[in-house]
Every structure is written in structure tokens, then in C-alpha cells.
């Protein structure tokens, strides 16, 4: 049986050859420097570029870095695959586009000692207008319909205790498209202790987002159905 570690960094990746080296290097410099007993699990979601080969080169040099490959199934599926492969007592969920800086990870790790989760807040945020509008809509929907109070529930920067990641794997439907938001919902409905931390958000250095405006409507409808279904099955724990 694989040996448990203190921290697993879970990083989905799809066609990120332009940024993956920077993303991995930052984990090594900023995260591994804080937590000695840690690993990085990069899930290549069927990339058609050199993403996997670049990750493999890192893995060949550093045993703490693991590459997991799967057929293209989307960001949500890759995240769930990474959580299944992770061995950490806590999991740090990040993206491979290197938009969120990790220089403040030490503060995140220290805050996690007294919390179930630390959730980032991108401020200021550097994304296309349609994504900013979508984030505001999702925030309002989550607060009003599902009592999820966090400022940035879908942020790709969450440090979460293992028990909550396992709970996500229990309730998320097969092929979940928004597991990161589901995790925020579980934390809120489970009365978890959550710290919100402002994180540095940078303009995208390379590659392109996998969801274009034309596909966004279908994705949002599927995501809403998924959220509503899980919300109906997960009771609210009162504090």
C-alpha cells in the first residue's frame, strides 16, 4: 500500500505545455519548501500537446512528482482522478495554468492547522469578461439557493482536509463537471471551519481556456443540475 504523505497537490492539466513547467516549478519552490512530506499529482487529461512529456521529465528528476494520464474527460474528471490517486492527509487543489501564485502558501498551510479548509479569493482577477460575469452569477446562485457563503467557490486554490475530499468522492456523480464547487457546497452544508485567503491572480501566460462562450450555456445547465441533485441528497449540519 502506498505510504501516506502530509500533503498532496492535485493539478489537472490539458494542453498546458506553455505553462506547465512554471506551474510545477512553483509547487517545488513554494509548496515543497514548506511541507517536506508532500507530493504533486499531475493528471494529464488527454492533452494533444507536449504537456505529458514535460511532466514526465519532471517526474524522472523528482520522485515527489507523479504523472497520471487519462483519456480526455474534462477538468472535473481530471480533478476527481487526482483526488483518487492522492495520498495526502490534506489536498491542495490547483490548476496548471499558473494563474494563481503560490508565494503565500506558507500562510495557507499555517491557517489550515486550525481549519478544515482554506479557500482562495482571486483579487484582483485577470480573466475575460464573460468569466467574471459567470463568477458573479454563480456566487449569487450559491448564496441564495444553497447557502454557500464563500466569495470564490470555484477558485482553483483550495487546501482541504482529506476527510472532505473523501466525502466529495462519495457524493459527486460519475463524470462530475463541477467537483470544486461541489466541495465548497459540502464544506458549507457540513458546517466546516473554513478560512478564506486572498491569493495573487495573474493573467494567463499561454494556452487557452477549454470552455468557450458558445459552450458555456450547455455546461452551466449541466452544472446547475448536478449542484441541485447533490444539494438535495446532502443534509445541512447546523452549528
What are these regions (language model features)?
Residues 16-31:
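Short, well-formed alpha-helical segments that are part of the catalytic scaffolds
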Residues 16-19, 47, 75:
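Donor nucleotide-sugar binding loop of glycosyltransferases
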Residues 5-8, 28-41, 50, 63-66:
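Short loop->beta transition adjacent to catalytic acidic/histidine clusters or analogous donor-positioning motifs
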Amino acid at each position: 500500500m502506498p505510504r501516506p504523505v502530509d500533503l498532496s497537490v492535485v493539478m489537472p492539466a490539458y494542453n498546458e505545455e506553455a505553462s506547465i513547467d512554471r506551474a510545477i516549478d512553483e509547487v517545488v519552490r513554494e509548496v515543497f519548501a514548506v511541507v517536506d512530506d508532500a507530493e504533486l499529482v499531475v493528471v494529464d487529461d488527454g492533452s494533444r500537446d507536449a504537456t505529458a512529456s514535460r511532466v514526465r521529465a519532471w517526474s524522472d528528476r523528482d520522485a515527489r512528482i507523479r504523472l497520471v494520464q487519462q483519456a480526455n474527460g474534462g477538468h472535473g474528471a481530471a480533478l476527481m482522478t487526482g483526488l483518487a490517486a492522492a495520498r495526502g492527509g490534506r489536498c491542495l487543489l490547483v490548476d496548471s495554468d499558473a494563474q494563481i501564485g503560490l508565494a503565500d502558501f506558507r500562510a495557507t498551510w499555517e491557517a489550515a492547522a486550525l481549519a478544515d479548509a482554506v479557500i482562495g479569493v482571486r483579487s484582483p482577477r485577470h480573466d475575460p469578461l464573460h468569466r467574471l460575469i459567470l463568477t458573479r452569477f454563480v456566487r449569487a446562485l450559491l448564496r441564495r439557493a444553497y447557502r454557500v457563503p464563500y466569495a470564490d467557490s470555484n477558485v482553483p486554490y483550495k487546501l482541504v482536509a482529506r476527510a472532505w475530499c473523501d466525502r466529495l468522492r462519495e457524493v459527486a456523480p460519475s463524470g462530475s463537471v463541477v467537483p470544486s464547487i461541489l466541495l465548497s457546497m459540502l464544506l458549507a452544508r457540513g458546517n466546516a471551519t473554513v478560512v478564506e485567503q486572498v491569493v495573487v491572480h495573474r493573467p494567463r501566460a499561454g494556452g487557452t481556456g477549454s470552455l468557450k462562450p458558445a459552450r458555456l450555456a450547455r455546461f452551466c445547465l449541466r452544472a446547475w443540475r448536478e449542484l441541485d441533485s447533490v444539494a438535495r441528497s446532502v443534509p445541512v449540519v447546523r452549528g
